[in-house]
Amino acid sequence: NQVNALYYNVFVCEHCGFSFTEDFSKYFSPGVSEEINNQISSKWNPHNFRGERTVFQAIEAYKLAFLCATLKKEKFIVTAGLLLRLAWLYRSLKDNEQEERFMKMSRDHYIESYSIEDYRSTQMSDVRVMYIIGELSRRIEDYSNATRFFSRVIETQRTGGEAKIIEMAKEQWNLMRATREHEHVDVKMESEA
């Protein structure tokens, strides 16, 4: 039986419920500790997340981390990553509705991160962020944003962008175009029938 490392990315304090990942900043702005105490710790029934986690415990840990990140005002790049991992966990349960919900939330947080460039001090590049926005947009069938962001990734090849990601963007752009053409043919055939 293989251990899924994704289940253990979030650290949860068994005493107060504060949850975080290694991506969180160490800084707490004034009033944040009190807010975490009011929103989480005061309602927390002490229990630990040590030992083997189920997918449901992993989901609980990520949701707690997202709440803590929101209260702490972590960067959008951090919250986007938490939401994306929640989408993956729901995908593993074949819960399409929740998967799509968290993909959309993640995509929106990546767009915020991209627009204010809060990813600059991380390992993420603008090309990677644009690709993720494009791919999440494609998956939630927001083809307008998918096209826009894949096109931006592809345009970076003129300035020596990341070749592997540019190729991935081209593949996804072509896949999206083929899917949309197929849908258009199906609609046309239905209207002729």
Residue ranges of model-derived segments:
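Alpha-helical linker/edge segments of TPR/alpha-solenoid repeat scaffolds
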Residues: L93, E97, I132-N145, E171-A193
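TPR/TPR-like (Sel1-like) alpha-helical repeat modules
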Residues: R107-I111, Y143-G161, N174, K188-E190
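N-terminal cysteine/histidine-rich coordination modules
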Residues: N1-N38
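Amphipathic alpha-helical repeat scaffolds of TPR domains
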Residues: E34-H47, F56-L64, E74-D95, M124-R139, ...
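Structural signature of alpha-solenoid helical repeat junctions
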Residues: V78, Q98, F102-M105, D118-D126, ...
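Flexible helix-coil transition and linker loops at the boundaries of alpha-helical arrays
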Residues: R50-G51, A65-T79, E112-Q123, R158-E162
